[in-house]
Swiss-Prot record:
Belongs to the krueppel C2H2-type zinc-finger protein family. One of its GO terms (molecular function) is RNA polymerase II cis-regulatory region sequence-specific DNA binding. GO terms for biological process: regulation of transcription by RNA polymerase II. It is found in: Nucleus. This is Zinc finger protein 583. It comes from Homo sapiens. Its main location: nucleus. Residues 6-77 form the KRAB domain. One of its GO terms (cellular component) is nucleus.
Length: 569
């Protein structure tokens, strides 16, 4: 686009005293606003402009009308510009011919003219260029009218128009002009007033905004300050440093936000829950929790998210992209936070410490879940059975009990599981893998939870306490079972006889009465039992018999030995 210089005279509209008196207060205010804004726009763009007298008068609040200079006529004095208006189109005749295009600066203007006597004087490029200049002007529907010819023509079979290719605005200016009665009384002033009133309202200059171009990436800006900030992306310049931690930033606004980390300032507060934030953007994201708004939708699966960052992370599920790689072991992750958490495995860092028991965790989420052991908080409740859980993941897993869903299947034996963790543990039955070893006794386990439970046998730790009787347990499952003593809950019912039990293991043992199953067999006598405890008791008989045989007691002493008591199987 051409960058011809724009002068204030190109965009200024001057009124004589007589014309100024025609304007009502609203129109005069509009004139002041447009004139001052155009002047300031040129100054802000670095255009060398000496302050015109009319601007000085406007700034002082004085009447800006100018003494009209007679006898100054342009190259085509018989023409004026007005915007298409239904009030005037009925009185003004127009003429048409095939469309032509003339270049004015860098603007391509389409115009039509079909009156022979008008062509020679008014269709030169120099005339248009003199009238419009090279600035961009929103002239969506511009009509050319001729003062001398039009009154002589009475028919309405011609139509002429001069339109720009920029059809972005259609102006409605019917209310900008005097009523018909006043217009007829002051016909000489009407044309001049009409022209300048339209120019005042709509001949607002939009100087080419893309004036400043980045030499590295060709991106354009309308302000030098924006370009300067942008160029720091390429140069890496970060001139704003935090005096607390030395971290640097490319923008002062980013430094101001960062400082709130040190000061703890959180000036942006949610009106719903009173939660405060250090940045307005964080508040905006948080408010979607209350409104439920999820404006970012995945094109693949239509899942919606409240934050664009969450959508970006989710899309990697479809693409399989894992751009964040651990430099220690090469494991890759779909987002940076997962990598940061993973790296603590290598460093052993556990920055999150429980203020009750002092236990430390590598992830903040683990600490929050752990603290619910102390508080007893279970915020996630099942709508089916009202059972509550301390973690949402546990609720999701539990709900599969009601739905019967078992989406995770073993490829070896086709056994299905409701949780992927159960599948992982099960697969170790086939592989024999026991990766979790106790450092105290060397005993190995197939899953970490079993190791954690086992280690409490060495430490004596019993973190799970019954609120009713203060009895403690090493396992949460043990506490859950114990609490049924107080509640009387018996959720496990036999589908044969209807008898109910508080423990699933008790139901399993009971059902063997109906099925006749005796899975525990003695290796010595092949006798079988329904329960492992019964088998263990029975095996002591053989142990005692072996002891008696080896010791070879005399008949007198043998009568004094206790007789083994048989167990009813």
């Amino acid at each position: 686009m051409s960058k011809d210089l724009v002068t204030f005279g190109d965009v200024a509209v001057n009124f004589s005293q007589e014309e100024w008196e025609w304007l009502n207060p609203a129109q005069r205010n509009l004139y002041r606003k447009v004139m001052l804004e155009n002047y300031r726009s040129l100054v802000s763009l670095g255009v060398s402009v000496s302050k015109p007298d009319v601007i000085s008068l406007l700034e002082q609040g004085k009447e800006p009308w100018m003494v009209k200079k007679e006898g100054t006529r342009g190259p085509c004095p018989d023409w004026e510009y007005v915007f298409k208006n239904s009030e005037f189109s009925s009185k003004q005749e127009t003429y048409e011919e095939s469309s032509k295009v003339v270049t004015v600066g860098a603007r391509h203007l389409s115009y039509s003219l079909d009156y022979p006597s008008l062509r020679e004087d008014c269709q030169s490029e120099d005339w248009y260029k003199n009238q419009l200049g090279s600035q961009e002007v929103h002239l969506s529907q511009l009509i050319i009218t001729h003062k001398e010819i039009l009154p002589e023509v009475q028919n309405k079979e011609y139509n002429k128009s001069w339109q720009t290719f920029h059809q972005d605005t259609i102006f409605d200016i019917q209310q900008s002009f005097p009523t018909k009665e006043k217009a007829h009384k002051h016909e000489p002033q009407k044309k001049s007033y009409r022209k300048k009133s339209v120019e005042m309202k709509h001949r607002k200059v939009y100087v080419e905004k893309k004036l400043l171009k980045c030499n590295d990436c060709e991106k354009v800006f309308n302000q030098s300050s924006s370009l300067t900030l942008h160029q720091r992306i390429h140069t890496g310049e970060k001139p704003y440093a935090c005096v607390e931690c030395g971290k640097t930033f490319s923008q002062s606004a980013n430094l101001a936000q960062h400082k709130r980390i040190h000061t703890g300032e959180k000036p942006y507060e949610c009106k719903e829950c009173r939660k405060a934030f250090s940045q307005n953007a964080h508040l905006a994201q948080h408010q979607r929790v209350h409104t439920g708004e999820k404006p970012y939708q995945c094109k693949e699966c239509k899942k919606a998210f409240s934050q664009i960052a969450h959508l970006t992370q989710h899309q990697r599920v479809h693409t399989g992209e894992r751009p964040f790689e651990c430099i220690e072991c090469g494991k890759a992750f779909s987002n940076g936070s997962f990598l940061a958490q993973h790296q603590r495995i290598h460093t052993g860092e556990k920055p999150y410490v429980c203020n009750v028991c002092g236990k430390a965790f590598s992830h903040r989420g683990y600490l929050i879940v752990h603290q619910r052991i102390h508080t007893g908080e279970r915020p996630y409740e099942c709508k089916e059975c009202r059972k509550a859980f301390s973690q949402y993941a546990h609720l999701a897993q539990h709900q599969r009990v009601h739905t019967g869903e078992k989406p995770y299947e073993c490829k070896v034996c086709r056994k299905a599981f409701s949780q992927i963790a159960y599948l992982d543990q099960h697969q170790r039955v086939h592989t024999g893998e026991k990766p979790y070893e106790c450092i105290e006794c060397g005993k190995a386990f197939s899953n970490s939870s079993s190791l954690a439970q086992h280690q409490r046998s060495h430490t004596g730790e019993k973190p799970y306490m019954c609120k009713e009787c203060r009895k403690t347990f090493s396992q949460n499952a043990g506490l859950a079972q114990h609490q049924r003593i107080h509640t009387g809950e018996k959720p496990y019912e036999c589908n044969v006889c209807g008898k109910a039990f508080s423990y699933s293991g008790s139901l399993t043992l009971h059902q063997r009465i109906h099925t006749g199953e005796r899975p525990y067999e003695c290796k010595d006598c092949r006798k079988s039992f329904r329960q492992r405890a019964h088998l263990a008791h029975h095996e002591r008989i053989h142990t005692m018999e072996s002891f008696l045989t080896l010791s070879s007691p005399s008949p007198s002493t043998s009568n004094q030995l206790p007789r083994p008591v048989g167990f009813i199987s």
